[in-house]
């Protein structure tokens, strides 16, 4: 077995046994601090409580360069566990996630803000190996360009880039003609013409594209977001086109934080066979470093349920501890076979239901085990936005039963991890308007039964009742907090958000009418 560790931005840990992922989880879920940095102590302890240290062969670490407290913490853990440690470069760790794809050969593109001195790495994946063919230094970072735009707009860089992407879809001017970063074919590298990154880049961009007003209007933000998104799509596709043509490879594995941009992903998927791992950001480094092991060929995944597991026995104890907070709620145990009907009827009654059961998802998306679900109506979109204190301009995503994607989406593809967007058919827009963005696109989880039988059953029950195989599915967390992890997190977040019902394991907590 290989224990994987990422101790940087969005720290995480994982455990792989031969060709199976046993555990993978982000430290932020345990500490309740978003994008938690540093040694992933709590998630590692969770794993070590499930296996004996003697069963672990070695520890793989994503990322090479570190100093100070990070080195100290890793050394302390190495002394404690007494195992060999292997360190892998940041973008190499990202890139080895190609082993989760079913491509025999692929062009692997890793792009993010930066790690171990690089911000871009292109490789050819063949069998178990990576051959590096192109790279960019930190100063020429595409991810940093987009993060600087995020900061310029008043959002949090390296966290709120999704807001920029969402704003870029709104109606508005798209008239900023400026080349601050580009892909240079002759160099096989991106080139940042600003010559600075971080806050200095934010200041430089502000001087170039913002007038002297103290505050940006919504129209200003849309205009700037369109510039950022257009630039991102153009230069990344330019790089992929160049490398794909040169090496005659049409299979693309896209990793790194920039691969969270689903608009960009869909542009790539229009031209190439695309695989984006569900944990494409730095949280995936722990797994990628472990997958660098030459003895591991491919690992097939059809879900991301690798984290903390909700257990009924523990849920019962927590409910007893918190019973004074639950006087206005009814608590009942629901047999597994009855969950689709019980939860389905609540949804049909236009209730908003929180699901917190089984193993926690790994990666940024909630896919049925730490989700808030409801009918995909505009009314529910507004209701949930208000309760979760989300930005009003951010769209919600749906879960759609895979069997019905052709009825709802234009040119759909299997997308089990919400990594792409698709246009919605005109005759279905009114039916599911709560999960459609202003540009008539949606970012679905296309769900097959073998990925999550009970979640599938809930949506199937709804379809059998009203003919709609779709639910609104958003992550179960309050604004600014990580997705809920354990039983206590789920109850506390449920009570604060004041939703209608919570399915905690097999315990249904619902408001007394």
From Swiss-Prot:
Q: Which UniProt keywords apply?
A: Transferase
Question: CDD domains this protein is in?
Answer: ASKHA_NBD_MJ1051-like_N
A Pfam family recorded for this sequence: Carbam_trans_N
Tell me which domain of life the UniProt entry assigns to the organism this sequence originates from. Answer: Archaea
Q: Name one GO molecular function term.
A: transferase activity
Biological processes annotated in GO: biosynthetic process
| Matches recorded under InterPro entries | ATPase_NBD (IPR043129), Carbam_trans_C (IPR031730), Carbam_trans_C_sf (IPR038152), Carbtransf_dom (IPR003696), NodU/CmcH_Carbamoyltrnsfr (IPR051338)
Q: Which family does it belong to?
A: Belongs to the NodU/CmcH family.
Q: What is this protein called?
A: Uncharacterized protein MJ1051
Specify the species: Methanocaldococcus jannaschii (strain ATCC 43067 / DSM 2661 / JAL-1 / JCM 10045 / NBRC 100440) (Methanococcus jannaschii)
């Amino acid at each position: 077995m290989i224990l994987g560790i990422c101790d940087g931005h969005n720290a995480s840990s994982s455990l792989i046994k031969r060709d199976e992922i046993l555990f993978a989880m982000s430290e932020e879920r345990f500490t309740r601090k978003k994008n938690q940095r540093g040694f992933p102590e709590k998630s590692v302890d969770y794993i070590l409580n499930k296996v004996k240290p003697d069963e672990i062969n070695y520890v793989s670490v994503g990322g090479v360069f570190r100093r100070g407290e990070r080195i100290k913490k890793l050394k302390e853990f190495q002394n404690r566990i007494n195992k060999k440690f292997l360190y892998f470069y940041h973008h190499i760790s990202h890139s080895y996630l190609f082993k989760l794809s079913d491509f025999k050969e692929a062009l692997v593109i890793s792009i993010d803000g930066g790690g171990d001195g690089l911000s871009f790495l292109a490789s050819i994946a063949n069998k178990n190996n990576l051959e590096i063919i192109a790279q960019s230094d930190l100063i020429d970072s595409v991810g940093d360009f987009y993060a600087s735009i995020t900061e310029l707009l008043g959002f949090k860089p390296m966290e709120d880039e999704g807001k920029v992407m969402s704003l870029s879809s709104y109606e508005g001017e798209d008239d900023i003609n400026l080349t601050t970063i580009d892909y240079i074919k002759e160099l096989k590298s991106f080139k940042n013409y600003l010559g600075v990154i971080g806050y200095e880049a934010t200041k430089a961009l502000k001087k170039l594209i913002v007038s002297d007003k103290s505050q940006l209007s919504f129209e200003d933000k849309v205009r700037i977001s369109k510039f950022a998104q257009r630039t991102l799509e153009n230069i990344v596709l330019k790089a992929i086109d160049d490398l794909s043509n040169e090496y005659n490879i049409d299979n693309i594995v896209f990793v790194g934080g920039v691969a969270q941009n689903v608009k960009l992903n869909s542009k790539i998927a229009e031209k190439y066979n695309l695989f984006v791992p569900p944990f494409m950001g730095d949280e995936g480094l722990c797994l990628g470093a472990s997958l660098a092991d030459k003895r591991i060929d491919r690992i097939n995944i059809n879900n991301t349920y690798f984290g903390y597991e909700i257990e009924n026995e523990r849920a019962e104890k927590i409910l007893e501890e918190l019973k004074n907070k639950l006087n206005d709620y009814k608590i009942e145990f629901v047999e597994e076979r009855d969950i689709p009907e019980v939860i389905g009827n609540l949804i049909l009654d236009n209730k908003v239901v929180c699901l917190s059961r089984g193993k926690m998802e790994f990666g940024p998306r909630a896919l049925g085990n730490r989700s808030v679900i409801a009918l995909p109506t505009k009314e529910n979109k507004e209701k949930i936005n208000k309760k979760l204190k989300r930005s009003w301009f951010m769209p919600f995503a749906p879960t759609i039963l895979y069997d019905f994607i052709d009825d709802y989406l234009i040119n759909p593809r299997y997308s089990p991890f919400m990594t792409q967007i698709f246009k919605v058919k005109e005759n279905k827009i009114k039916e599911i308007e709560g999960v459609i963005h202003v540009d008539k696109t949606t970012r679905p989880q296309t769900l097959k039964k073998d990925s999550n039988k009970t979640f599938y059953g809930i949506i199937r029950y709804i379809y059998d009742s009203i003919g709609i195989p779709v639910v609104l599915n958003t992550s179960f967390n309050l604004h600014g907090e990580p997705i809920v992890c354990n039983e206590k997190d789920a109850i506390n977040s449920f009570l604060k958000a004041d939703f209608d019902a919570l399915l905690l394991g097999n315990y249904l907590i619902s408001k007394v009418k």
